[in-house]
Amino acid sequence: MGRFISVSFGLLVVFLSLSGTGAGLDCPPDSSLYRYFCYRVFKEHKTWEAAERFCMEHPNNGHLVSIESMEEAEFVAKLLSNTTGKFITHFWIGLMIKDKEQECSSEWSDGSSVSYDKLGKQEFRKCFVLEKESGYRMWFNRNCEERYLFVCKVPPEC
C-alpha cells in the first residue's frame, strides 16, 4: 500500500509540474517556453517596425511580445532581468497606437486586443517599450524610429 501511494504521489508531482507549461512543445535555441509560446530576447538595436518585421520573418511567424496577463508580465520581466547588462534599459514590445488621433485604439502587433495593461507615464508617441527602471513591468511609449533591443513571441514547433 505504501509503495502505491509513493508511485501515485510521484506521478501527481510530474503531472502538476508539466501541466500548463506546454510540455512536449519545442522552442528554438535561446528561447524560453511559457504557456504555449516561445519568447526570445534579441540583443540587436532596431526600430519598432524593423523589430516587428524581424519577428514575423521567424519560421513560425512570430510578433513582438504581447503581454496579456500579470503572470505573463512577470515571466517577461524575469526573462529580461536575467538576460540584460547594466546599460540595457529599453526593450520594444508589440504594443502600438494605431491612429495618432485616437490613443484608445491601441492593439498588439499580433492582432490581439489589450486586455491587461501596465501603462507608465505617457507621452504622445506611438510605440511602446519595457523599461529597466520599472523592473521591466511598466509600458512606456517612445518614438517608433528609436532603436532598442526587443522580445519576440512565437508559436513553438509541434
UniProtKB/Swiss-Prot annotation:
Pfam families: Lectin_C
Keyword Chloroplast: no
Species, as recorded: Daboia siamensis (Eastern Russel's viper)
Record protein name field: Snaclec coagulation factor X-activating enzyme light chain 2
Gene3D superfamilies referenced in this protein's UniProt entry, alphabetically: Mannose-Binding Protein A, subunit A (3.10.100.10)
Expression by tissue: Expressed by the venom gland.
InterPro entries assigned to the protein according to its UniProt record, in alphabetical order: C-type_lectin-like, C-type_lectin-like/link_sf, C-type_lectin/snaclec_domain, C-type_lectin_CS, CTDL_fold
Domain C-type lectin intervals: 34-153
One annotated GO molecular function: metal ion binding
Entry's family note: Belongs to the snaclec family.
Glycosylation sites per record: 82
